[in-house]
Amino acid sequence: MSEAPAVMSAEQLLREAVIRIARSDAEPLLLHALGRDRAWLFAHGRDPVPAEQAQRFGALVERRHQGEPVAYLTGSRGFWTLDLAVSTATLIPRADTETLVELALERLELTAGVRVVDLGTGSGAIALAIASERPQAQLIATDASADALAIARHNAHAHGLHNVECRLGHWLQPLAGERFDLIASNPPYIAAADPHLQQGDLRYEPASALASGSDGLDDIRLIVADTPAHLLAGGWLLLEHGWDQGEAVAALLIARGFAAVATHQDLEQRDRVTLGQWPHAAG
């Protein structure tokens, strides 16, 4: 008879896993395999883990070792104060984008009827974060991917955010004839030939949400050109971009007629969001 595999505790499983992957990756994968939270791990880390769950964890570790993003393996990612479902149809929300949310909130009055758009919403991260902090605002989240929009709708429902409407379409197409107080977007902004697209987590994320032409600015140009027709006088456009694109994006906004154009840095002190205010009553 062959010997049964040794029963291991959660702590032992983690110690073995960190030989292959980072502990910061191993821990959420273990909790996902166990269906537990961090408080349980702290209290029960020495408890034996059933073989089936240990095997599931081992398979997740192997997939992470091969490069799959933790967020896709667990199906979720924390953003702002929200736990969001994600899939391979959506970009993985990142902490850098919280800079855009903070800047948007600073520019939204605490009054009923404020209208906000999140272009290319993906998982809904930007729209839902704003909606959670400004329940009196009306949010519209657009995306060209029906699969991504289904994830955004799921997340809105899961968090009880009923002030968010999801619309299918490319950038501003679903907004014909409407004007808003603020439009925000984290569009694709990586150059199509950038080697980083073939490295790390980016290999697994949807290319349509990452790359945008030879200089990474094709989609930003489209948004800047078309947004004024959808802004109220004094309305704001906020765009996330790459660390080295601040000057170029600011120049596009200024050339289009935006005022109060400024570039803001993320938590790593890198240029990350450029914004401008539309001063006119018509686009």
Curated annotation (Swiss-Prot):
Its EC number(s): 2.1.1.297
Binding positions (substrate): 186-189
GO terms for MF: nucleic acid binding; protein-(glutamine-N5) methyltransferase activity; protein-glutamine N-methyltransferase activity
Residues that hold S-adenosyl-L-methionine according to the record: 120-124, 143, 171, 186
Coiled-coil residues: none
Function, in words: Methylates the class 1 translation termination release factors RF1/PrfA and RF2/PrfB on the glutamine residue of the universally conserved GGQ motif.
Family: Belongs to the protein N5-glutamine methyltransferase family. PrmC subfamily.
Protein name in UniProt: Release factor glutamine methyltransferase
Organism in which the protein naturally occurs: Xanthomonas campestris pv. campestris (strain ATCC 33913 / DSM 3586 / NCPPB 528 / LMG 568 / P 25)
